[in-house]
Amino acid sequence: MEGIKYIASLVFFFVFLEASKTEPVKHSETYCMFQDKKYRVGEKWHPYLEPYGLVYCVNCICSENGNVLCSRVRCPTLHCLSPVHIPHLCCPRCPDSLPPMNSKVTSKSCEYNGTTYQHGELFIAEGLFQNRQPNQCSQCSCSEGNVYCGLKTCPKLTCAFPVSVPDSCCRVCRGDGELSWEHSDADIFRQPANREARHSYLRSPYDPPPSRQAGGLPRFAGSRSHRGAVIDSQQASGTIVQIVINNKHKHGQVCVSNGKTYSHGESWHPNLRAFGIVECVLCTCNVTKQECKKIHCPNRYPCKYPQKLDGKCCKVCPEEPPSQNFDSKGSFCGEETMPVYEAVLVEDGETARKVALETEKPPQVEVHVWTIRKGILQHFHIEKISKEMFGGLHHFKLVTRTTMNQWKIFAEGEAQLSQMCSSRVCRTELEDLVQVLYLERPEKDHC
């Protein structure tokens, strides 16, 4: 019976939340509103609570004055060694008092991961929530053909050998699950009448004291509904996220994409097996539906040399390196500067380091490629490609701007290193040579 008392507490708290939901009706009409559903006077029902489904241990009735009265079911003391739990019933029964099989109520069963579950049956789902904590577990229930799953936070255990119980995914200490449902009277919770003349909430003499009740209830994010309720992590147990699985489709207050769970309003880039993360497509979880759209990059940028960054779909304008002193015309001490790009690729134990210079005359990009294995230069060559082709190479990053004179110094030193590093290990020589391309600020701003 572990967890049933907690579920009933959730129901009573939810009834209190429902008390704030009222509608103007005529005096001649008397009915009860509960979970956005109308009930006639005298009508009885079991409340519904995700992810547990119908709570058979709580009975609700619509009274003559329009109040919703919910009470816990009082289970009798059984005088048998092995009581049996019956679906659709709160209290267990002794085997000799079970009804015949042909009188069993027929309800829709549920299908989940190749297993069929009967209405009211609880089970554990592994791998449903990817971001669950070590003290959390996924508990599901079957209710009228729908599978309701929730992430439940388990209480801290104070024993060395916890045991499993049939009605909860959380393990408990032996004896903790044997909760007593023996009460002198049923606990009753009232909801104000749904009439034009409003009634304030009246506590029944059977209701538990406020201090006792508040201590065992989770804090809800809002008072409109229990859907999407966020449970305090310090509470003993509770549901953080609900997922409703109807047939083979998942829906509820979350979206599931590529094995990951996203809450309403959360955005992400889809991860396709053949392409990896698609940076230029953005998906957003809209209650239960994934809405994906293509990101359109601007045709013009406020800077002359926008930069492609890893993890970004569109190019961005880089911040100008603070150590350089360019004037408004993109020159350094009267000499024109050109952008320098760099890329480092590692594959099969080889490192390819590329340094590229973009020139206006001629309009091309000169790429110097170094292929290094175990610190020794294996291959060196120079490529000249068009700006259009270079624009499609997203692994290059803008590192600085340099002048043609500095680039010539770099090329001369590069020729010397290509001979020297082909026969011995060169670890810092190329890195030191690249520093030649960085322009130093002249003293007192004089060239």
From Swiss-Prot:
One example GO MF annotation: transforming growth factor beta binding
Gene Ontology cellular component list: extracellular region; plasma membrane; synapse
Top-level taxon of origin: Eukaryota
Compartments, record wording: Secreted
Region (Disordered): 199-219
Keyword Transferase found: no
GO BP, sorted A to Z: AMPA glutamate receptor clustering; BMP signaling pathway; cell differentiation; cell fate determination; embryonic axis specification; excitatory chemical synaptic transmission; eye development; negative regulation of BMP signaling pathway
Domain VWFC intervals: 30-95, 108-174, 253-318
Glycosylated residues in this chain: N113, N286
Signal peptide: 1-22
Transmembrane segments: none
Key words of the record: Developmental protein, Differentiation, Glycoprotein, Neurogenesis, Osteogenesis, Repeat, Secreted, Signal
Main localisation: secreted
Record motif Cell attachment site, residues: 174-176
Gene3D superfamilies named among the record's database cross-references: 6.20.200.20, Complement Module, domain 1
Keyword Aminoacyl-tRNA synthetase: no
Function: Seems to antagonize the function of BMP4 by binding to it and preventing its interaction with receptors. Alters the fate commitment of neural stem cells from gliogenesis to neurogenesis. Contributes to neuronal differentiation of neural stem cells in the brain by preventing the adoption of a glial fate. May play a crucial role in dorsoventral axis formation. May play a role in embryonic bone formation. Plays a role during anterior segment eye development.
Protein name: Chordin-like protein 1
Organism annotation: Rattus norvegicus
Lineage, opening ranks: Eukaryota, Metazoa, Chordata, Craniata, Vertebrata
The encoding gene: Chrdl1
